[in-house]
């Protein structure tokens, strides 16, 4: 049979074939568009300082904390921290992913987000050109609206949380409280962590540790000479409990003043291990990470005793950070599986993230010149409940529960404090601009 001799098919069959072809073409084009969007098509900032010519090298552990302090290795180290040998003289504790990952569909096209920075009107690509962002995700109603990577980073790579991990630790406290493993937030830490008995932190309540209001004299500047370095050196020689012994001066009565101190999150990890009999990773794997629907395993750096350094040092993919943000945005429930109920107790989560449920000293403009502080979480000014998980060098997860909006921002900023560069201001304007796309801030 020659080409001209093909039989005529029924119209219904040919129409079905045409529809299937159109669907396949549309799917392929959408996939191609997202593949292009994932890859930087703009001039990436500061590639020389970040050592692109050396393939974004990975730093090393040791006294100099090369992996953390050296700008040249920041991109490589912040996407391989879980694998660097010798950090805290320990290894990484792993949380296995879920059998059924949370569904994260992608929008057919990106919204045209625009916002003002001074006299300039910016879009997403403009922001990426201006800031050292390794990954940026915007998720609305459980659907990815924007996903960008630069500096040769990929969706499959784990990114370092820095202090965003503190909120994860706080959520573990809430789960343990609901289970009765922690009887009261007003119990002293030493009730659950006998190794802290007699120390300043041991005599501080769990609630005051959650709010970073122990009253301890503690300066955190990330210069290798501050109280964080002094605490870290003692902890490396032994454990977090040994680190607690060098923090001895209480400048203010507990509960009265917010003072940022990463050591207080490590104390919560000790409390949780004593209360649950498990490491933080083992406890959260079956209670949060897998129920949440994580797609990829996570790594959490631990010391020589197996205790996670809970104030940071957590490593996960950008999409799994987005899933965590969605869990928080939906008040502890999984948006694609509401039948699972509360994974994080809603009442506790709302208390942790609502500035109105904390004393005035922890309110926005009081705790800091802009942010307020809840339970290991930063709260925004305004009537609407909005909050963020923040980490040094530009890490952030923005959460707007009312709009079911999450933004993941993973970066390699030039300075530990984003506010010391243009990133601090411009990231806030990005958040406000995206929120403004959907309604008033």
Regions found by a protein language model. Give the residues of each.
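Active-site-proximal loop and beta-strand segments within enzyme catalytic domains
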Residues: 113-129, 143, 154-156, 176-258
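Active-site helix/loop module of the DD-peptidase/beta-lactamase fold
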Residues: 160, 179-217, 249, 274-312, ...
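Active-site-proximal alpha-helical segments within enzyme catalytic domains
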Residues: 170, 264-271, 312-334, 395-411
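Bacterial N-terminal signal peptides
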Residues: 29-39
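Active-site-proximal binding-pocket segments
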Residues: 284-285, 290-354
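N-terminal leader/targeting segments and the immediately adjacent pre-domain N-terminus
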Residues: 14, 19, 41-154, 182, ...
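Active-site Gly/Thr loop motif
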Residues: 295-298, 353-406
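Active-site SXXK
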Residues: 142, 160-185, 209, 268-272, ...
């Amino acid at each position: 049979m020659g080409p001209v001799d093909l039989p005529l098919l029924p119209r219904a069959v040919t129409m079905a074939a045409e529809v299937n072809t159109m669907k396949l073409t549309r799917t392929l084009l959408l996939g191609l568009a997202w593949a292009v969007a994932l890859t930087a098509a703009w001039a990436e900032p500061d590639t020389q300082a970040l050592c692109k010519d050396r393939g974004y090298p990975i730093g090393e552990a040791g006294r100099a904390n090369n992996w953390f302090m050296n700008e040249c290795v920041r991109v490589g180290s912040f996407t391989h921290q879980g694998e660097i040998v010798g950090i805290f003289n320990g290894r990484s504790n792993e949380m296995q992913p879920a059998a059924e990952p949370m569904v994260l569909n992608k929008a057919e096209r990106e919204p045209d987000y625009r916002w003002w920075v001074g006299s300039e009107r910016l879009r997403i690509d403009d922001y990426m050109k201006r800031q050292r962002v390794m990954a940026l995700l915007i998720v609305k109603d459980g659907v990815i609206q924007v996903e960008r990577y630069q500096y040769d980073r990929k969706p499959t790579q784990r990114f370092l949380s820095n202090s965003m991990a503190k909120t994860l630790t706080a959520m573990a406290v809430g789960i343990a409280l609901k289970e009765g493993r922690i009887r009261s937030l007003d119990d002293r830490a030493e009730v659950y962590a006998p190794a802290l008995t007699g120390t300043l932190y041991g005599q501080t309540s769990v609630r005051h540790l959650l709010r970073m209001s122990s009253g301890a004299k503690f300066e955190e500047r990330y210069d290798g000479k501050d109280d964080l370095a002094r605490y870290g050196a003692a902890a490396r020689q032994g454990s977090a409990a040994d680190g607690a012994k060098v923090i001895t001066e209480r400048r203010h009565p507990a509960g009265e003043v917010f003072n940022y101190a990463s050591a207080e999150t490590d104390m919560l990890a000790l409390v949780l291990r004593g209360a649950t009999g498990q490491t933080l990773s083992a406890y959260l794997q079956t209670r949060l990470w897998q129920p949440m629907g994580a797609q990829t395993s996570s790594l959490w750096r631990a010391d020589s005793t197996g205790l996670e350094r809970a104030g940071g040092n957590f490593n996960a993919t950008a999409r799994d950070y987005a899933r965590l943000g969605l869990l928080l945005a939906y008040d502890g429930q999984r948006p694609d599986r509401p039948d699972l109920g509360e994974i994080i107790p809603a009442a506790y989560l709302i208390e942790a993230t609502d500035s109105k449920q904390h004393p005035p000293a922890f309110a926005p403009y009081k705790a800091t010149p802009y942010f307020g502080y809840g339970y290991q979480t930063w709260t925004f000014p305004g009537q609407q409940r909005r909050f963020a998980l923040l980490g040094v060098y530009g890490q952030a997860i923005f959460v707007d529960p009312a709009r079911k909006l999450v933004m993941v921002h993973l970066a390699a900023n030039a300075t530990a404090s984003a506010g010391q560069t243009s990133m601090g201001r411009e990231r806030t304007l990005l958040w406000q601009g995206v929120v403004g796309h959907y309604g008033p801030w």
